[in-house]
Amino acid sequence: MIPLDFLEKVEVFKELDDKQLTTVQTLCQEVGFARGERIFETGETPKYLWVVLEGEVALQWELPGRSALPETTISILRPQKTFGWSSLVPPYKYRLSAYCGTRTCKLIKVEREGLTGLFETDPATGYKVMTRLLAIVGARFLSLQDEIAKRRGSDIMNQW
């Protein structure tokens, strides 16, 4: 069972009290992956929200019919970080692929069905989690915008 001490530090669960965390804990399962192993693929219908327990996860943009490359890595996630938010937001399709980026990765998978069921029976928990999730997605979007601006600026400078 995933310790409550860890769950309370997870970015998406930080606002939850012990009772709410205990309920979330029942939906969690620890799984392991090896370096380079795919956790999920772009376009798949998500069944889980994921949390990094140990190791690193690389989120990569994949072109259809091509293998993942380091250059297509959008983000590296470390312990306590959440990914797979598409499991909670329509149209419920993963936007990126996820790979284990270290020798081994230990992850927590949180059942989407159980989590959405919890949100229906306990709207306060749902509100707290979705508010945190929105903040996380927003911050990642801003980070991506900054990276695109840097690259475009560099391209413009190189054309002079």
PLM features: residue spans?
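Cyclic nucleotide-binding regulatory module and flanking cytosolic helices
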Residues: M1-E30, A34-R35
